[in-house]
Amino acid sequence: MPISLRLAWIPPLLTLAACATASPPPTATSTAETNSVPASIAGQSAYGLFLAGQSAINTGEGAAAAGYFTRAAGAADGADAPFVETHAFTAALLAGDIKGAAAIAPVSDDDVVLQRLAFLTVAVDDLASGKAAKAHTLLGQVGAPYNAAGSLLTPFAAAKAGDGEAAISMPVIANDPVASYFASLDQGILFEHLRRYDEAETAFRALIVHGDPGALASLNLGAFLERRGRWADAVATYDQALSRAPGDPTLLAAKARAASRHDAPAMESLDASAAEALTALSSTLVVRKQSEAALAYLRLALRLDPERDAAWLLVGDILTDIGDKDAARVAYLAPKPGQPDYVAARDKLAWSLQADDRKDDALELARTAVTAEPASREAATNLADLLRADERYSESAAILDKLIADEGDTPDWRLLYMRAVDNQLSDHWPEAENDLNLALKERPDEPELLNFLGYSWIDRGEKLHEALAMVQKAVDADPKSGAMTDSLGWGYYRLGDYQTAVEKLELAVSLEAGDPDINNHLGDAYWRVGRRIEARFQWSRVLTLEPDAKLRAEVEAKLRNGLGPISGS
């Protein structure tokens, strides 16, 4: 659903945004035109421009919609004007035109919630434009539901306005642990900006003692120590964080930099640090399924720091989820080679193209990322994943061969797992089995490995009792997995315990109702216990679940002829 039509988080816009089409201005007659007028032929009247904006929204063109609504707002008068201006403001905000949104923000609106969003938008634009004192005043008028954002931005506005004491005054944020964490983190950042170094270090260390989620406090403290020339202390800080998050690439890179004793990272600007806080808030909103609010905060963050790649990735993810693929791809193009998020962004962009069946373009993009970042395992494994999706298994395995060889005697079990998939799908089972056994030596309790090898043995009719024990262990570790429960049920089926198989496979279908293989297995089990009508129902259902050609042919044969007599397990 297009972004500007799902603004239920802004109460004044509920009547405009609660469904897949918004209403025309109050004085206009609602007709089918509101859903079908092409933007290219819309008139220049306020109503014509409004309809053009509606059309752009309905086709997922958020930026174009914002332009039309803004022009409509300029042309509207009388009773229609507030309605159109509200559309123009929210469309511009969500499309990322913060300057445009600030220029038409309804700061005098009668609805206090919409007015507070307007204050927040104008304040961010003022802060980014160097009008810190004005921004600080406006942020004092931002309340619920935007109070966390306003509270986090206020100290940065105070610091930019030259009020150091106000800048280090800890904001009071209730019932929002993420915002409270960033308020404390930002206090350390602001102490450093104010050259109160002892207090900055104390603030960072206090956060680390209390858990340091994401190692953000450790990274900030380490960078702070590097800037002070305290290289050994910085390395120790990163080591401590790595003990909690072994292999974290950001921490490893920071440690290597500190160990080299040069190129200490520059202190981020106040605007960039404020943008980081807004980006963190948006992440929590995404988890809460409040995508539009998250997108608004991300757009505001990018007004403060246009090069905040983490924000661009989240923008791309949200736009992908709501169907604005072109805008999402623009967001994924923002991170540049050499930046930490470049490979992740290219991976997402490649899979976006893959989803549109642009397979060659996706592979070209993935190969470009490998060329740009030859040391990146993530770039290489993404290329392997795309090749596997295209059923080019030997090429995928060849990439993994090199990665596994580079890791020496103890390669990452995940690489072995992926190569096993390639080998199994290309009918090289002995090689796949060997990789799975090697991976299990490294991770003997990993449910995915136990299920893969166990199910493969079951399906091949090999080592059935050992295999059943393996998949039972996998199910015990992940009882909500429909795939693993299916493996268990299929194991009982192959052992001839059809009644237990039915029980397990019914549970598997309840956990993953849309899987054609699980439904097929349940149909077979029903048949073996004499429940023929239910068996045919399950097989018929398989045909509605997009089975591959091989499974479709198998099921169609069973619907015609049923299952033959048991020839052994």
Question: Model-predicted segments: where are they?
Answer:
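N-terminal secretory targeting signals
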Residues: 26-28
